């Protein structure tokens, strides 16, 4: 197996020059650089990733901790992050918590041992103790979406409160006064903020919030299906339902369809996230748009910026994205 000394000898340069060419740590004349790369190719030399990381203090790797990569919302973000990592010459370690808080500790320990250059966090389960452990390593972290505030981490906020308000306001503007909710767990920041936006819009319109129309679950189609069936057992029903994710909306629409009830003529449905498949629902889903690819790319760019600069001079920043209403055909206008 060829060594760096073999490459240096064939190229007629020092091993230090070979190292600078490979790691791009110093300017090397074009002819010299070409001679080095020709020697590398001829000898089929593959530098040790571990040795290179120790030499230049980087592993060219990023860790990403998320709730689950199976959900369409997360999957679209992961795809954008992974593609951008590839374009920037980084590899990605993807860690799923599956809503299990204890998993984050193991993931953090693993990422520290892997000597990742930085970490993206997109889950609500991490604890203050976990953050303090990680902050002690000086590894940069960007908290995406609904994570807890931290003095050492950058944050990207999606303004779920604003999105909840927009969704409810749209239903009200279309003449709906009896509005229900199928949410995720309201103890979670994401659901709590969307619910608070819902409450604000309802209170501004002087509309009552009926607790028997408020259902909690998770962000899966099965939850939307189950909670819609529970709702349909009531004597008095709302004319519209605000589902806290498009996947919840899919389950809710399916439950109505199984009973021969159509959307939106029988009941209007509005979703949240604008996942790729939502436009292909039957009917196409009116929803709240979040730019998943933009969120992922922005988070990674901030992290890469932090990796490259002096950590003692960096001030953590907070970036906000604002949701938008996407009009399709799942909300009936009762004003007509």
Curated annotation (Swiss-Prot):
Gene3D superfamilies: 3.40.50.2300, lambda repressor-like DNA-binding domains. Pfam families: LacI, Peripla_BP_1. Residues 4-23, 48-56 bind DNA. Keywords: DNA-binding, Purine biosynthesis, Repressor, Transcription, Transcription regulation. GO terms for molecular function: DNA-binding transcription factor activity; transcription cis-regulatory region binding. PROSITE patterns: HTH_LACI_1, HTH_LACI_2. Pathway: Purine metabolism; purine nucleotide biosynthesis [regulation]. Is the main repressor of the genes involved in the de novo synthesis of purine nucleotides, regulating purB, purC, purEK, purF, purHD, purL, purMN and guaBA expression. PurR is allosterically activated to bind its cognate DNA by binding the purine corepressors, hypoxanthine or guanine, thereby effecting transcription repression. Consists of two structural and functional domains: an N-terminal DNA-binding domain, approximately the first 60 residues, and a larger C-terminal domain, approximately 280 residues, which imparts the function of corepressor binding and oligomerization. Homodimer. NCBIfam families: PRK10703.1 (NF007979). This is HTH-type transcriptional repressor PurR. It comes from Actinobacillus pleuropneumoniae serotype 5b (strain L20).
């Amino acid at each position: 197996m060829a060594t760096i000394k073999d490459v240096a000898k064939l190229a007629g340069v020092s091993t230090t020059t070979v190292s600078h060419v490979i790691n791009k740590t110093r300017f090397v004349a074009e002819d010299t650089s070409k001679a080095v790369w020709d020697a590398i190719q001829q000898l089929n030399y593959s530098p040790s990733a571990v040795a290179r990381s120790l030499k230049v203090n980087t592993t060219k790797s990023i860790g990403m901790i998320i709730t689950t990569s199976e959900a369409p919302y997360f999957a679209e973000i992961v795809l954008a992050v992974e593609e951008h990592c590839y374009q920037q010459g980084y590899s990605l370690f993807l860690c799923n918590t599956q809503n299990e808080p204890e998993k984050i500790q193991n993931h953090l320990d693993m990422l520290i041992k892997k000597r990742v250059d930085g970490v993206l966090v997109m889950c609500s389960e991490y604890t203050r103790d976990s953050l303090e452990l990680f902050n002690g390593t000086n590894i940069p972290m960007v908290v995406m979406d609904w994570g807890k505030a931290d003095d050492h981490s950058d944050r990207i906020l999606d303004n779920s409160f604003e999105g909840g308000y927009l969704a409810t306001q749209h239903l009200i503007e279309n003449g709906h006064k009896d509005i229900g909710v199928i949410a995720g767990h309201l103890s979670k920041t994401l659901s709590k903020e969307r619910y608070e936006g819902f409450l604000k819009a309802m209170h501004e319109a002087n509309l009552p919030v009926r607790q028997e129309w408020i259902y909690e679950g998770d962000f899966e189609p099965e939850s939307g299906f189950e909670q819609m069936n529970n709702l349909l057992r009531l004597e008095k029903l709302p004319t519209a339902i605000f589902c806290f994710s498009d996947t919840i909306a899919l389950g809710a629409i399916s439950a109505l369809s199984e009973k021969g009830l159509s959307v939106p003529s029988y009941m209007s449905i509005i979703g949240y996230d604008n996942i790729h498949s939502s436009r292909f629902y039957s009917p196409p889903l009116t929803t709240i748009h979040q730019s998943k690819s933009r969120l992922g790319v922005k988070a990674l760019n901030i992290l890469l910026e932090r990796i490259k600069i002096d950590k003692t001079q960096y001030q953590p920043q907070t970036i906000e994205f604002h949701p938008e209403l996407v009009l399709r055909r799942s909300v009936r206008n009762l004003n007509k």
